[in-house]
């Protein structure tokens, strides 16, 4: 088995699916064949799906349509995992261990290999999590006892911890890759081998999963910038608003912007937004402007534009 992905967070089911799909589309090698997918909803429902050929293009079906996104209850699941490789793997249900009370165990190489205790190593991890061990404690305990097993294991427990580790044997391979990311309550781990280009795809897969789970940040407020707004000299590109969040002037440090005329980026992404002397946030939008003699003539080819800002972490006063 060449790739294992596990995630916990909002829409983890969709995140794991899209992460695998992106890897199939960009990568080459032993991928796009069988897939065994599992997800656990917030209320503890286990949902499993399998395919032997086609990977994500046949994993989920809606009527006569293949290659669809997971159904809503799967897409919104809080924990999800998948293991995938080339086509036609025997007993795919044994390659991803799952239990509603414990969590999910995926991985790459041969996670169903029987370990020193006479039980497959992925099932050993699941059994330990059933007994109350965290994902990290369970994976470490099993791989400490089985350093030469041909497996990398990735587990997500019911508390939401996602943890992965390769055995000493797998770490000696020249073609393995992994990536881990955790941000704002969302976590994902990707392990794989035998997929090219093997040094870069893992990071892509994790970022795609995180992007699905975290989504686009929502603005804390809106700023309105109208044509005719003055541009005055300042050491930064910034927007200064009145009590109604309408721009009263924009600052810039470019001589041409203040005194000439032309076309340029006027308000940068992440520009400070002030209400009076108080920093209230940073812009989530970038505008292009046409300016004439120190005033905005057009903002993103319009006479008036509203865009969002994210709230500042601390209240500051402008210099």
Language model features: what each stretch is:
Residues 1-319:
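N-terminal nucleophile
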